[in-house]
């Protein structure tokens, strides 16, 4: 049982790290010339000063939805980890981790929705930027976090507390 708890906790922490990096780092979209766009700032690489020059992102409604969903996924994932720890120490033997599992499933749905909106509406979100480029690693991390959170939620729902 302790190995299972260790694996489930490690999976949850991995999902949290993936979500933090995906939400806060600066590479949801990469353009030629080392320009990097994220959910919060548009950053360009200044070759003479060798620094990043960043400005606020557009006021696009779809981007605001992606921002809100990614922040919501982080909050839900943190909440589900806290719930798991509380349930682990207060729940009676034989109980199921329904609340934790439901929270993780909602995390998965929020990440899925945010990444899907960004993928579908990328042209609208990036309208003021030159064409070309590709999705960055933060976008990929969000898609990796989605199935992991889904599997984690299912595991929590089926997990019983034992001694």
Curated annotation (Swiss-Prot):
It comes from the Eukaryota. The chain crosses the membrane at residues 4-24, 66-86, 100-120, 139-159. Glycans are attached at residues 46, 56. Its main location: membrane. The keyword Transmembrane applies. InterPro entries: EMP_3, PMP-22/EMP/MP20-like, PMP22/EMP/MP20/Claudin, PMP22_EMP_MP20. GO terms for cellular component: plasma membrane. GO terms for biological process: apoptotic process; bleb assembly. Keywords: Glycoprotein, Membrane, Transmembrane, Transmembrane helix. It is a multi-pass membrane protein. It is found in: Membrane. Disulfide bonds: none annotated. The keyword Glycoprotein applies. PANTHER family: EPITHELIAL MEMBRANE PROTEIN 3, EPITHELIAL MEMBRANE PROTEIN-RELATED. Belongs to the PMP-22/EMP/MP20 family. Probably involved in cell proliferation and cell-cell interactions. This is Epithelial membrane protein 3. It comes from Rattus norvegicus. The lineage of its organism: Eukaryota, Metazoa, Chordata, Craniata, Vertebrata. The gene is Emp3.
């Amino acid at each position: 049982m302790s190995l299972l708890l260790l694996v489930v906790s490690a999976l949850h922490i991995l999902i949290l790290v993936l979500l933090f990096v995906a939400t806060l780092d600066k590479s949801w979209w990469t353009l030629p010339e080392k320009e990097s766009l994220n959910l919060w700032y548009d950053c360009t690489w200044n070759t003479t000063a060798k620094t990043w020059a960043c400005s606020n992102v557009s006021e696009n409604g779809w981007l605001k939805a992606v921002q809100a969903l990614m922040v919501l996924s982080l909050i839900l994932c943190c909440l589900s980890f806290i719930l798991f720890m509380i349930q682990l120490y207060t729940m009676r033997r034989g109980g199921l981790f329904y609340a934790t599992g439901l929270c993780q499933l909602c995390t998965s749905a929020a990440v899925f929705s945010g990444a899907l909106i960004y993928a579908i509406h990328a042209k609208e979100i990036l309208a003021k930027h030159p064409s070309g480029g590709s999705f960055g690693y933060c976008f990929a991390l969000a898609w990796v976090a989605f199935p992991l959170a889904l599997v984690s939620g299912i595991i929590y729902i089926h997990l019983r507390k034992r001694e």
